[in-house]
Design a protein with these regions (language model features):
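Short, Lys/Arg-rich flexible segments
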Residues: 1-77, 95-146
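Short, surface-exposed beta-strand/loop "edge" segments at domain boundaries and coil↔beta transitions
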Residues: 71, 80-92
Length: 146
């Protein structure tokens, strides 16, 4: 079905479903990558003196794409409040240590990923999200040059 577009506002509205889906796909990629590195973090060290809660492993969250003031937005984040039951340490501190490759503030394993930094390196910094966006737009019939 053809849409009549008379101005830039009409064009922006017509493009919103495509942009929303593209942003949701990009957020999914970041979320999957974050969960991959969260799992690698847990796999890198097996605690001897305590039993794991697994709250940090399940602390990654994704908010589906939506249109806000004419723009498609989505969120992927580590929920610090989700880790509120750690003894004597905040969720913020747990996430900070994990991003420094530390377990409980200590360097206990040589192969511990820096969870958030490696997520960004493998999605944003390496251009994967841009490639995914271009591929999606092309699949929708857009001509895209990078």
């Amino acid at each position: 079905m053809a849409k009549e577009i008379n101005n830039m506002d009409d064009l922006a509205i017509a493009l919103q479903p495509t942009m929303k889906k593209m942003i949701d796909n990009m957020a999914n990629r970041v979320y999957e990558t974050l969960n991959f590195f969260l799992q690698r973090y847990y796999d890198s060290y097996n605690p001897i003196f305590y039993r794991r809660q697994y709250d940090f492993l399940r602390s990654g969250f994704k908010v589906n794409a939506r249109i806000v003031r004419g723009k498609a937005v989505a969120s992927v984040y580590i929920d610090m409040d989700y880790m509120s039951n750690y003894y004597g340490v905040t969720g913020q501190q747990v996430a900070t240590w994990a991003n420094e490759g530390l377990h409980g503030g200590k360097n206990l394993a040589s192969n511990t990923p820096h969870v958030w930094d490696e997520t960004m390196a493998n999605t944003v910094d390496n251009g994967a999200l841009v490639r995914d966006a271009v591929a999606y737009l092309k699949s929708q019939g857009f001509t895209v040059r990078v």
